[in-house]
């Protein structure tokens, strides 16, 4: 679904390090060396374009049609490898040049543009607007997954000066501020965002309201003050760090902003084993247990799809990660398409590479605006569809049947209702949820 707003189809690829050095620099060097092997392997079997003509790879039996389009996207672990990938592209004289890997030194820096978080924030603002609240003007309470050094969480937590961040956690620390002062805490979050590799332990505790604090996730037990209990809506006097994270996730706040890594919400009908994220089994809750009004999914896979549906069925406002965080993928796609368009002019020596680079940089704000239009329109489309309620079930059913017959859709994989479940929805006068 995330690739619906862009040109290519997507696939996940990866590679495994056979030798894993313990020393940090050696590990990075080994990772890059293996990344190069992986990319050369891909380009060895990819069609190229030379002087406008398609050239298949040598000594390769091709079972598919001509297909020279291959781009690689930065992901967890390879986020800083774009220049390395583009050097391999140059080594192979690959037709895409430095459009092969977006976001390199001559490309759009997603974190500097805050594009993924800004796209997710478009969705958050829509949810609030549909509840009758303008968060550009009014204060709102929030909890978060992530920390200020992260692109999605950090940028997201700086998109409104009215955010009252009650609690947040990352893999090392838990931050709790029961009665936050929006102005003071915004300035402190901005300081942490600018501080390289900052964590919640770097937060100036003098700015935390009475009864709050920053706690280690390695602690045996944490005492919950009366202020913490009120803010988080719990009677527990003490809790282990894992128990406290579950309490935070269930807090009665307006927004849950997820900018972290891991799956924290499943459906009651799912087991932890089915989720496939063992590291977070101890902190995961069910969708029906959430008490926040809105979820913004800046990070990937924060919820299972069933968890989203369960939360939405009890009145929660949520889209999906693919909708909320499509900004990064969308921005990369714009970059690649602009580079392809200008590539022919550069090759024909009508434009110098330096002039192309200057033009790319000049277009940064315009590209961001175009990406955010997609975020606005796709969340609007979901709202319009949701507004049709029960009347949408029949056309949706026909569309699903058609897509299944053409092998574009597998309802079971996407957790979409079958004909029996659709009949139940009709009889109880319920439409599809936003995630569906």
Please provide the spans of the model-predicted regions.
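Non-transmembrane, aqueous-exposed alpha-helical and coiled segments at domain scale
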Residues: 32, 36, 43-65, 78-436
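Short, surface-exposed loop/turn segments at secondary-structure boundaries that line and modulate
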Residues: 14-15, 150
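Conserved anion/nucleotide-ligand pocket segment
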Residues: 68-69, 73
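Segments forming glycine/polar-rich beta-alpha architectures that bind adenosine-containing cofactors
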Residues: 1-9, 14
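Short acidic-glycine loop/turn motifs at beta-strand connectors
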Residues: 9-10, 19-20, 157, 268-269
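Short secondary-structure subsegments characteristic of cysteine-rich extracellular domains
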Residues: 16-39
């Amino acid at each position: 679904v995330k690739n619906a707003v862009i040109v290519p189809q997507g696939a996940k690829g990866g590679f495994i390090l056979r030798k894993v050095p313990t020393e940090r620099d050696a590990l990075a060097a080994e990772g890059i060396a293996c990344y190069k092997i992986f990319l050369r392997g891909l380009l060895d079997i990819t069609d190229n374009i030379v002087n406008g003509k398609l050239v298949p790879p040598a000594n390769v039996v091709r079972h598919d049609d001509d297909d020279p389009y291959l781009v690689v996207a930065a992901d967890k672990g390879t986020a800083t490898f774009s220049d390395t990938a583009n050097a391999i592209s140059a080594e192979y004289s690959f037709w895409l040049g430095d459009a092969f890997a977006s976001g390199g030194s001559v490309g759009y820096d997603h974190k500097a543009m805050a594009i993924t978080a800004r796209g997710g924030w478009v969705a958050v603002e829509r949810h609030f607007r549909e509840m009758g609240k303008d968060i550009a003007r009014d204060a709102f309470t929030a909890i978060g997954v992530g920390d200020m050094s992260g692109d999605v969480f950090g940028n997201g937590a700086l998109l409104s000066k009215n955010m009252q961040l009650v609690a947040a956690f990352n893999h090392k620390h838990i931050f709790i501020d029961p009665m936050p002062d929006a102005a003071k805490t915004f300035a402190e979050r901005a300081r942490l965002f600018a501080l390289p590799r900052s964590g919640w332990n770097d937060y100036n505790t003098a700015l935390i309201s009475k009864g709050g604090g920053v706690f280690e996730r390695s602690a045996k037990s944490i005492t919950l003050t009366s202020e913490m209990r009120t803010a988080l809506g719990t009677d527990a006097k003490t809790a282990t760090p894992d128990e406290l994270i579950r309490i935070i996730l269930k807090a009665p706040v307006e927004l849950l902003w997820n900018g972290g890594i891991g799956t924290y919400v499943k459906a009651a009908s799912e087991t932890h084993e089915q989720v496939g994220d063992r590291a977070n089994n101890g902190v995961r809750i069910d969708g029906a247990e959430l008490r926040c009004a809105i979820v913004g999914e800046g990070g990937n896979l924060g919820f299972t799809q069933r968890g989203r549906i369960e939360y939405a069925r009890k009145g929660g406002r949520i889209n999906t990660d693919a909708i909320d965080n499509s900004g990064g993928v969308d921005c990369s796609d714009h970059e690649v398409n602009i580079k392809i368009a200008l590539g022919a002019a550069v090759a024909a020596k009508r434009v110098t590479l330096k002039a192309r680079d200057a033009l790319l940089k000049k277009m940064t704000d315009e590209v961001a605006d175009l990406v955010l239009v997609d975020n606005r329109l796709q969340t609007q489309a979901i709202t319009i569809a949701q507004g049709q309620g029960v009347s949408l079930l029949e056309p949706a059913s026909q569309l699903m049947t058609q897509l299944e017959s053409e092998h574009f859709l597998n309802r079971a994989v996407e957790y979409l209702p079958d004909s029996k479940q659709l009949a139940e929805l009709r009889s109880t006068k319920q439409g599809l949820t936003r995630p569906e």
